[in-house]
Amino acid sequence: MKLLGFLIVGLSAISALKTKALHLTCEQELRPYSAVVDANCMAFALNGSNIHEAIKYLQAMNIKKAYVLYWNDHDLRGTPMVLYDNGALAPFDPYTNTAKYVLCVEACPCPGSKAASVGGFQAATSSEKIYVEGSARPAQCSEVCIEPVERRPHYKKIVVNPSPSNCIPCEPECYDSSSSSECNKKRCKTFPRICKEKCGSRRRGCPRKVEVLKSQKTYTFDIEKYRRRGEVVVRVCSKDSKEKFERFILSRNGEIRGNNNKNCILEPLPKCLRCPGQLHKLKKHIERKVCQEVCMYINAKCDIFVLVGDCDFYRVVVNDRRRYRNLHLKKVRGHKLRELIKHGLFGVEFGPLDLDR
């Protein structure tokens, strides 16, 4: 009853509140209500009378979908619904239907008015006008809030998904000012290939054991050596049934040389790694596009993938390899992502190598 009373009071004072979309971290995607509580906001109560305004808000903010925690007085905080910018409303699924945003409401006080407590949060009666970056006209926070004529309207700028051209490539951050050494770059995740093999006797009555094998491989290119001499030292670290370390020199035309050990037969480099200079430029171009450092991988078919942040996996599609004009990042999710990780990925890194290792 207490919760129902809060909802009634909140709905009666909704004109004094403004809609807001909270961006969720990876941990918050499966429990969006915690983000609403941490932001000191109220859960947005979606119903037939305000669903069109909510859809317009998503379209104006360039948000494809967002969680809603109430629908027609039904409490959905445990199992939220996902509202799309096209009007579709679908139930939450942790594998196939998640969102990066959650809709909530926060106080929108009018200047000179007293704030009223709504459900434990401060709601108000003033007008703070908001406009969305790139929108044609500003949208008022509330129709009830009337601002004095002699007072110039105040606009608060909200930037959602800023244009890549306005971004500055992110540099590694140093938190230890006392250390003069170079900052440690972001450690990329590893995705080993996991397979199961049956072993043991084939005789009747003897159960066969299942052995789980894990294998992974990381290619590291000394790109500075490539720029100076026209050759690049490639270090390949393999971890499978036994750890293996390989190092060889790759010329500009992709030929391997400098290996005189007949007992050590090097595995051929994948075709997509034969031009590390172009691959390094591609990685830097993607980092400028997304305005952050990314991790690069390839699969057994030599498809190129990047991991942006800790959650978003993309396949790199390049139609024009000369200037990357038609570069497209195609997101991999759901069943395809699980299958991709199951079959394993090879890491691709660039950096100076210690030749004494």
Curated annotation (Swiss-Prot):
Presence of the UniProt keyword Cytoplasm in the record: no
Motif (HBM1): 150-158
Localisation: Spore wall; Spore, Perispore
Keywords: Cell adhesion, Glycoprotein, Signal, Sporulation
Signal peptide: 1-16
Sites carrying sugar chains: 47
Keyword Glycoprotein: yes
Gene Ontology annotations of biological process type: cell adhesion; sporulation resulting in formation of a cellular spore
Sequence motif: HBM2, positions: 329-334
GO cellular component, one term: spore wall
The protein's role, per its UniProt record: Spore wall protein involved in the adhesion to host cells surface glycoaminoglycans (GAGs). Microsporidian spore adherence is an integral part of activation and host cell invasion which requires the extrusion at the spore apex of a very long and coiled structure, the polar tube, through which the sporoplasm is pushed to enter into the potential host cell.
Domain notes from UniProt: Heparin-binding motifs (HBMs) are characterized by an XBBXBX or XBBBXXBX sequence, where X is any neutral amino acid and B is a positively charged basic amino acid, and are defined as the consensus sequence necessary for protein-heparin interactions. HBM1 motif is necessary for spore adherence to host cells.
Name assigned to this protein: Spore wall and anchoring disk complex protein EnP1
Phylogenetic placement of the source organism: Eukaryota, Fungi, Fungi incertae sedis, Microsporidia, Unikaryonidae
Gene behind the chain: EnP1
